[in-house]
């Protein structure tokens, strides 16, 4: 991956990139650049479903207090939650047509809803999706 990613104007975060960022996994430095961009001029979003994933995964790794702090930091950084009321039909369409994991379907739905680029990790649920712009921050799973 490039040291300096080209940051789109609108970024939708899947859970994996944010878990990598907050848990200092490989690629966290790349995600930091995306978060910094959202704190600047870029628009950042996360599906409510993916936010729940971030919270419970960080909680399992670092505890409840840290997980709640992560959710607060995301809100303060300007990453806006996209609620399921806005995206459930889009997520259902992605799930029906491509069978990604449900969390990935909601991430795709959020990206379609805000016309943004979905930032994902190494999982292959989005590999053949062309209806939404997708950027991978890493190619190897952790």
Q: Which ranges hold each PLM region?
A:
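A general alpha-helix detector
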Residues: 53-54, 73, 90
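Short beta-strand scaffold positions
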Residues: 13, 45-46, 82, 102, ...
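Short, well-structured N-terminal submotif of metal-dependent ribonuclease cores
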Residues: 1-46, 59-69
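Active-site neighborhoods of divalent-metal-dependent phosphate/nucleic-acid chemistry enzymes
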Residues: 80-118
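Acidic, PIN/NYN-like endoribonuclease modules and their adjacent C-terminal/linker elements
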Residues: 1-5, 10, 80, 108, ...
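Short glycine/serine- and small hydrophobic-enriched flexible loop segments
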Residues: 56-59, 112
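Alpha-helix capping/helix-boundary segments
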Residues: 17, 50, 86-87, 106-107, ...
């Amino acid at each position: 991956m490039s040291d300096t990613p080209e940051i789109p104007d609108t970024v939708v975060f899947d859970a994996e990139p944010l878990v990598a960022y907050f848990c200092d996994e490989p690629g966290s430095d790349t995600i930091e650049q995306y978060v910094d961009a959202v704190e600047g001029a870029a628009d950042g979003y996360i599906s409510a479903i993916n936010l729940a994933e971030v919270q419970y995964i960080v909680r399992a790794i670092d505890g409840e207090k840290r997980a709640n702090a992560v959710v607060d930091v995301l809100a303060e950084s300007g990453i806006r939650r996209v609620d399921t009321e806005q995206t459930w039909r889009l997520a259902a369409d992605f799930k029906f047509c491509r069978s990604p994991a449900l969390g990935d379907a909601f991430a795709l739905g959020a990206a379609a809803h805000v016309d943004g680029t979905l930032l994902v990790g190494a999982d292959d649920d989005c590999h053949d999706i062309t209806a939404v712009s997708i950027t991978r921050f890493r190619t190897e799973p952790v």
